[in-house]
Amino acid sequence: MRLTGASRLGMLCGLACAGHGPALAQTPSPSAQIAAAVLPLPSSLRAGAGVVVLDTRGQPRELRPSANGMVCLADEPGDSTFAVECYPGSFIPLIYRMRQLIAGDMPESVLDQTIEAEARSGRLKLPTSPVASYLMSGPLSAYDWSNNTASDMIVVGHRLYVPYGTAAAMGLPTAQDGIHPYVMASGTYFAHVMIEHHPVRH
């Protein structure tokens, strides 16, 4: 089953790839980037989470090492979107590899085939148990770097990745139905349960 571009990009650039308004004139300080990157996490996980920022080639630069197994991707400067996302370390190799292939302008169908082949061969290690993700995304103008707060124009998302899991096995639908969780990319390396997406709540 080939993945859809919307499904993949929903993870790789947050919940809303296209932001509105001007980009930042300069890159925020590392401490500000770290504070923003861990914001999607439950408060109990923030202090120990590692933070990396990816360059245009999809290569990571560590801003802070992880002390609890969680790794957050900082907002990438230079555009008008605020997007940060956090995953357990076991899922990060897949994130890095997908970002690298996308940065190289690999066609979507070839990317799927490449990831699938690398995962099946064992070259690319995937998690052996479900892993959670925490995301925040929206227009850059809706995030205040000075006090690390987001308005309700920023959307929060929680997902559970279950590589090769199927909707049937989990007893879930494959399309959104009211408030119920549902599965996207069922049966693929990218299979994930969409738990909830909602504007930031204060």
Question: Model-predicted segments: where are they?
Answer:
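Bacterial N-terminal signal peptides that target proteins for export
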Residues: 1-11
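Sec/Tat signal peptide C-region and signal peptidase I cleavage site
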Residues: 20-25
